[in-house]
Amino acid sequence: MSVRRSERKPSKMDVQTKAAELAKYTIDNALKESIVPKRDRWALGNRLVDTALEMATRIDSANTLRLDSIEEASQRRLEQRMALSATFRMMTLIHTARAITHFEERIHKHWTELVSEEQELLRGWMDSDRRRSKANAD
């Protein structure tokens, strides 16, 4: 029996899937002349792409690390924090690009919603790891 979409719980690794989607969306937008003109691409476009790729690769890296080793758990937490930090940098870059290039509001809204959703998923994953670590320690 299948579960209705509205009743589904988020998958454990929606964070990874959404990060890849956000990275793709960011790369596509950063290369569009109407969003980041060539004159601004070296300053804004490249940084947007680099930040999106950093976020996605750090999430992938964190996912390969296990919680049953103290060293790996610590490294995983660091990768998660760095990925979360990248989402905040990405949000700043998106707002800056909008202020400079005045691309469409609907694109800005959708893009920032994707980033906010990724931040929520990342925080949820980090909280889940924290709860699992505490449960294993008890």
Label every model-predicted segment:
Residues 1-138:
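Amphipathic alpha-helical assembly/interaction segments
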